């Protein structure tokens, strides 16, 4: 497989009715794989993420720009009769619809799965929500912070003597988007066999709970909820974060073989000879004691000294880097992940590209994130073969809202 053979999802048409992060992240991932993603936006303000900031660059939200590459924007008023008719026609011509409204919203708009399926029985319909379509909490709204707490992830994150702590990125939104993209790919594969589309239901709660993995396993087997341990591992030591003289690093002495290498490279035969540290289970039980021995030693030298020392001995380790360090990392540049593109408002726009590589080749350069309603005419012509008169007729029906800006090329 090679990108020069054509993108994997080339020819797949996706109608993106999503806002903010979870849905847009899913559709961006599918766009990265070559799908033709049509982002439907409210005509006057667009995706609310366009207003999130600072920072803004050239009037564009960095938040919005980060999850909306490889898409085209079409401004449609979903509450107008003309807008609803237009969505029905676009869904009839498309392969996938993805939305992240609260359950029942699309039905109230007259654009629910059953309605769209009647127009196109090959349609894959993916609904993303906070708690799913079923169950006693189905109608609750879903927000990243809320779901980080509801999923149990915050309860096991943070220092043992500190408060529950959220993950530094929007992990609930992002992992849900990952699952949604995966589910859509599976549904398209199934459609290839059966000829029929179907409904995909992706819940933020389900997605986050799935990340508990061994933490859930510990509860199911012991009946006890795991507790916060800071950055320490529950069954391995030393396997946590340590402070150097100028920063922080992670050390993962994951087994007895690594322990022997660690003691040797640290020139600490006394630690290797200590019978109480002989086995991994023993070291885990004496985690606090062992950490107290190592902490003052690690504070004597810089971060990069320790990471180089342990890397030379093939002991798992790594610096704790700032976002800036990561965005400038030579490794990401070399692999084609850290890139730049030109945007008419934002100018030279740097971004982290798709991580998917085929035959060691990174994906082609991405299409820049769209301006609001920039491709309305273009899409209606391509997807629906509309002429100017038909487009004007939909405008008269209120399909594009009160503003005519969305009908102007390049707006």
PLM region descriptions:
Residues 1-196, 371, 377-411:
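N-terminal helix-loop segment corresponding to the beta1-alpha1 unit
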Residues 44, 131-132, 204-209, 246, ...:
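Glycine-rich beta-alpha junction loops
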Residues 55, 229-234, 239-240, 346-349, ...:
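Short Gly/Pro-enriched turn/cap motifs at secondary-structure boundaries
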Residues 133, 161-171, 192-208, 224-234, ...:
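Conserved Rossmann-fold dehydrogenase catalytic segment
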Residues 177-197, 210-221, 263-269:
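Oxidoreductase and adenylate-handling cofactor-binding alpha/beta cores
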Residues 235-313, 317:
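Aromatic-enriched alpha-helical interface/lid elements that frame and gate functional surfaces
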Residues 312-364:
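A glycine-rich dinucleotide-binding beta-alpha-beta segment and adjacent secondary-structure elements
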Residues 349, 354-388:
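C-terminal active-site "lid" helix and adjoining low-complexity regulatory extension at the edge
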């Amino acid at each position: 497989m090679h990108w020069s053979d054509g993108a994997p999802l080339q020819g797949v048409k996706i109608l993106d009715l999503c806002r903010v992060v979870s849905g847009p992240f899913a559709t961006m991932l599918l766009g990265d794989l070559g799908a033709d993603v049509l982002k439907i936006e409210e005509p006057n303000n667009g995706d609310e993420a366009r207003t999130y900031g600072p920072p803004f660059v050239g009037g564009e939200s960095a938040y919005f720009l980060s999850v909306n590459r490889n898409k085209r924007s079409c401004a449609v008023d979903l509450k107008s009769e003309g807008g609803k008719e237009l969505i029905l026609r676009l869904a009839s011509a498309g392969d996938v619809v993805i939305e992240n409204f609260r359950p029942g919203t699309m039905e109230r708009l007259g654009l629910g799965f059953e309605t769209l399926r009647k127009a196109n029985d090959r349609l894959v319909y993916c609904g993303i929500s906070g708690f799913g379509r079923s169950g006693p909490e189905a109608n609750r709204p879903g927000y990243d912070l809320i779901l980080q707490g509801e999923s149990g992830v915050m309860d096991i994150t943070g220092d043992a003597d500190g408060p529950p702590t959220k993950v530094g990125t929007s992990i609930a939104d992002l992992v849900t988007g990952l699952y949604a993209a995966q589910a859509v790919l599976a549904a398209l594969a199934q459609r290839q066999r059966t000829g029929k589309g179907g409904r995909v239901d992706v819940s933020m709660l389900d997605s986050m709970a799935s990340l508990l993995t061994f933490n859930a396993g510990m509860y199911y087997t012991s009946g006890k909820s795991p507790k916060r341990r800071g950055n320490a591992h529950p069954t391995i030591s030393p396997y946590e974060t340590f402070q150097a003289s100028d920063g922080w690093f992670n050390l993962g002495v994951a087994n007895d073989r690594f322990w022997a290498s660690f003691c040797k490279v640290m020139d600490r035969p006394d630690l290797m000879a200590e019978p109480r540290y002989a086995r991994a289970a023993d070291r885990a039980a004496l985690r606090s004691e062992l950490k107290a021995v190592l902490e003052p030693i690690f504070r004597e030298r810089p971060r990069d000294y320790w990471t180089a020392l342990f890397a030379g001995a093939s002991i798992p380790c790594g610096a704790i880097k700032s976002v800036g360090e990561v965005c400038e990392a030579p490794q990401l540049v070399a692999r084609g992940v850290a890139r730049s593109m030109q945007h008419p408002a934002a100018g030279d726009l740097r971004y982290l590209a798709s991580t998917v590589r085929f035959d060691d080749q990174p994906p082609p350069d991405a299409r820049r994130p769209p301006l609001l309603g920039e491709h309305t005419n273009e899409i209606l012509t391509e997807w629906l073969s509309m002429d100017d008169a038909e487009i004007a007729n939909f405008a008269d029906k209120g399909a594009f809202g009160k503003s005519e800006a969305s009908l102007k090329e390049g707006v």
